[in-house]
């Protein structure tokens, strides 16, 4: 395994060096697992880190798959900090993480995805250039693109690009088209997104009640000071 910070998971657009490295590793089916570790594990930095498990000898059940493991909650607090290091992973927690890895199952701490789940095609959306109310055309009669209106979309590799365009883009930009010559495939792993758990917002009544209670506490403290 290799320990990285979060940047190599997602930094760089399609076609960039970072994305091309991810693409190379994933399309060759070498990425077996990514394990998120707790923050504040290291002496010189408090940032979160990730272990990339890379191999060219995947077992049959792991072929074409990537296992993500959220190990961010597996830690004990140190009695005394050492620089930025305030947490450690004890033996029992290491065993738990190893067991999660070996079980290769979807659960609270483990998510399993097909390789292509992390890939997308960045497509360029063009719109016609208009001058004096008329669409400007080239010698073949095709509309010329307006670079000022140029946009892009990320289409998951699991989706058909034409169908995505018809569903998501064309209804809003009926005169637009895709310039397939500019399409590029990229890969990213948005780790926290896959383990996100929605927490309902507190109601306004609860917040108002808490503010009233805090106000009363403040008034009582002020009265004690004045007395």
Residue ranges and their predicted role:
Residues 2-223:
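A conserved structural/catalytic subdomain of Rossmann-like adenosyl-cofactor enzymes
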Residues 226-227:
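Short acidic DE-rich linear segments
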